[in-house]
Amino acid sequence: MRFRIEHLIEAPLARVESAVLAPGALIELARRAPLIAEARELARREEGTAVERVGYLCAKAKLPMASRVIEGGQLAWNERIVFDRATHRARFTIEPALRPEWRSRFVCEGSYVLTETSKGTLRTIEGDLAIRAPIVGPAIERAVIHRIADVFEAEAEILRERCRG
């Protein structure tokens, strides 16, 4: 299932980009996003104009009914993003903490683009989510995309605040 999320941040692109890539951004997301219980940066590597960041995020809600699929019933995932400062674009993948036999049934990847406009910086996130589960897959995809949008909305609010000050 394809998704697209846009946010306008009323600040220059360079300021928004710095806020997006700032160390500690994931920790702040855990404090502010209602759905996130924990978030931390696992790895960060900068080379030339590229910044690669791997983050760990864990949802507040447990899903005991999904313990067959999700490790410990706790919805958690790693987010890998490779951002190119020269093009203001990134590629991301989301790797959920699923039992090994279920990992190939979940795919989420996409792009993250910052574009300067006359009103500020437009942040566009486009992605594809596929959950290969008979009958319920599309319904789960819609629910997950809704949650992804909620997390990106919380992140947009954090970016707006960071860019104001």
Language-model features: locations:
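A generic beta-sheet turn/junction motif
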Residues: 9-11, 85-87, 116-118
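Sparse recognition of residues in long alpha-helices and their boundaries
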Residues: 31-33, 97, 141, 164
